[in-house]
Amino acid sequence: MSNPIAIDIHKILQLLPHRYPFLLVDRVLEITPRETITALKNVTMNEPFFQGHFPDFPVMPGVLIIEALAQTAALLTFSEERAEDAIYYFAGIDGARFKKPVLPGDQLIMTARLERGRAGIYKFAVQATVDGEIAAEANITCAVRSKGA
């Protein structure tokens, strides 16, 4: 078992291809390579999606919570190094549940646990919490492929 480490935004930008407005991970709090990761997203009123979802009661869209969880899982996969031509595809989701709305001012704490990984296909158990309460959880499948494949 490795010692847990943290990753700042500069390293996240090296590991993920996502950029504003689609980079949904601000910092990795703890990562144990090939095992688990805990990351955070500071949700602010300045998020572009709040303009339309919903103007009178802004709520982070569930699909973007899942995307943030997938990016967290990608960081677990790429935590040591991302091949220059590698791209991370979202390949499937099972058992998604949304239990608490995520609002402006919330700090979304995201965890991913690697369940299986073989031949570039990875399965994760993921969970997002706010103030210690589960906001969303799912099992996701992701695939790492060459950009040209």
UniProtKB/Swiss-Prot annotation:
It is found in: Cytoplasm. Its main location: cytoplasm. GO terms for cellular component: cytoplasm; membrane. The active site is at H53. GO terms for molecular function: (3R)-hydroxyacyl-[acyl-carrier-protein] dehydratase activity. GO terms for biological process: fatty acid biosynthetic process; lipid A biosynthetic process. This is 3-hydroxyacyl-[acyl-carrier-protein] dehydratase FabZ. It comes from Polynucleobacter asymbioticus (strain DSM 18221 / CIP 109841 / QLW-P1DMWA-1).
